[in-house]
Amino acid sequence: MSNEFITFEKISRKSWKQLHQKSKPLLTQEELTSITSLNDNIDINDVVEVYLPLIHLIQVYKIAQENLSFSKSLFLKKDIQQRPFIIGISGSVAVGKSTTSRLLQLLLARTHKTSTVELVTTDGFLYPNSTLIKNNMLNRKGFPESYNMELLLNFLDTVKGGQTASAPVYSHEIYDIVPDQQQTFTNPDFLIIEGINVFQNQQNNRLYMSDYFDFSIYIDADSHHIEQWYLERFLSLLELAKHDPANYYTRYTSLPQNEAIAFAKKVWKTINLENLEKFIEPTRNRAELILHKAADHKIDEIYLKK
């Protein structure tokens, strides 16, 4: 961490867990296991020591947002419609964004029992493979230019305006957008938007996705740790694909393991690492909170914007 983080306060896990005294985890180990991504590592202690204080912090931000909205309505002398509290979550491929997103969704729903908590990933706003192939961009999938940013920003604007909005659905099994399938959102109380690109701005220099966020999180780790997690996940995906001929990864299951690992390392170096170093990691200081993971996937440090 460099002077890039001069606007953040560094908090150790030991200090962070003392900021919230509730000891009940709000979910069972079985529920936690069911929402944990392939090859991620999280347990009930992580929920109690890291995520319950985080839920409490999000509540602080939500109350502040509601107070500001109310004060604005008084100033403008008009009613302001209740709008979703939007949380953006970013980080590298294989760093554990999906686990964090699903866990926050569950914990927020358990904490705010009458609230609706929705989750959407920016994968759905990738251009379909057919479009990427047509424009000779398939090898740039995941890079900023492979996303339909106009569609994504329009979605966020519609949701933030309290209107019903729809998002395309992406499948990692087929490695493509699912044809004729949409995910619909009708003014939820909370919306979590997760993706590698949520702090990026590719096309319109005057508008960032983060302009719509009320809170934002970056999941951080050393790149050599993320590479190891990526390779482990790739091998696990190959195991699953052996029993599913329709799975995108089936085409790689016939490779000897050493060749499969060599292929995955090449993909990591030429695509994922380049994307991380050039486009993802440089945006992390736009987050309100950075959760740093150690080699064992455990969060060891927290950085909160001052």
From Swiss-Prot:
Top enzyme category: transferase
Q: Which Gene3D superfamilies match?
A: P-loop containing nucleotide triphosphate hydrolases (3.40.50.300)
Q: Which reaction does it catalyse?
A: (R)-pantothenate + ATP = (R)-4'-phosphopantothenate + ADP + H(+)
InterPro entries in the cross-refs? P-loop_NTPase (IPR027417), PanK (IPR004566), PRK/URK (IPR006083)
The places in or outside the cell where this protein is found are:
Cytoplasm
Single GO MF annotation: pantothenate kinase activity
Which pathway is this protein engaged in? Cofactor biosynthesis; coenzyme A biosynthesis; CoA from (R)-pantothenate: step 1/5
Q: Does the keyword Transferase apply?
A: yes
Which CDD domains does this chain map to?
PanK
Q: What is its EC number?
A: 2.7.1.33
Q: Which GO terms describe its cellular component?
A: cytoplasm
Q: Which of UniProt's keywords are assigned here?
A: ATP-binding, Coenzyme A biosynthesis, Cytoplasm, Kinase, Nucleotide-binding, Transferase
List the Pfam families hit by this protein, alphabetically. PRK (PF00485)
Q: Which GO terms describe its biological process?
A: coenzyme A biosynthetic process
Residues annotated as binding ATP: G91, S92, V93, A94, V95, G96, K97, S98
Per the similarity annotation, which family is this?
A: Belongs to the prokaryotic pantothenate kinase family.
PANTHER family attached here? URIDINE KINASE
Known NCBIfam families for this protein?
panK_bact (TIGR00554)
Q: What is this protein called?
A: Pantothenate kinase
